[in-house]
A protein has these predicted regions:
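A detector for short, charged/polar N-terminal pre-domain segments
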Residues: 1-6, 73-76
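Conserved hydrophobic/aromatic packing and binding residues within compact polymer-binding modules
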Residues: 11, 25-26, 36-39, 65
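Residues within helix-turn-helix
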Residues: 23, 34, 52
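Recognition helix of helix-turn-helix/homeodomain-like DNA-binding domains
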Residues: 30-44
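DNA major-groove recognition helix of helix-turn-helix/homeodomain DNA-binding modules
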Residues: 49-64
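Short, charged recognition helix plus adjacent turn
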Residues: 64-78
Length: 78
């Protein structure tokens, strides 16, 4: 999973957890809804300032939007 996919997944999850629509998030961030949609579909890469702005609105750290999911531990072979 590349960093755009990681960001897309975390952005969507954080937005939904906060209970915001793409439209509401875009309005608060001062950007277009279609840009939020494209970010959530891994179509565009966000600038550092956009990542920071979105994180602030979502109430998370910017780094949280870039964190890869933890890998599940593998079951030991018997």
């Amino acid at each position: 999973m590349d960093i755009r996919e990681v960001f897309a997944r975390n952005l969507r999850r954080s937005r939904q957890t906060k209970g915001l629509s793409q439209e509401a998030l875009a309005h608060e961030a001062g950007i277009d809804r279609t840009y939020i949609s494209a970010l959530e579909r891994s179509q565009y890469s966000a600038s550092i300032s956009t990542v920071d702005k979105l994180a602030t609105i979502l109430g998370v750290e910017a780094a949280d939007l870039l964190k890869r999911p933890a890998k599940a531990p593998r079951a030991a072979k018997t």
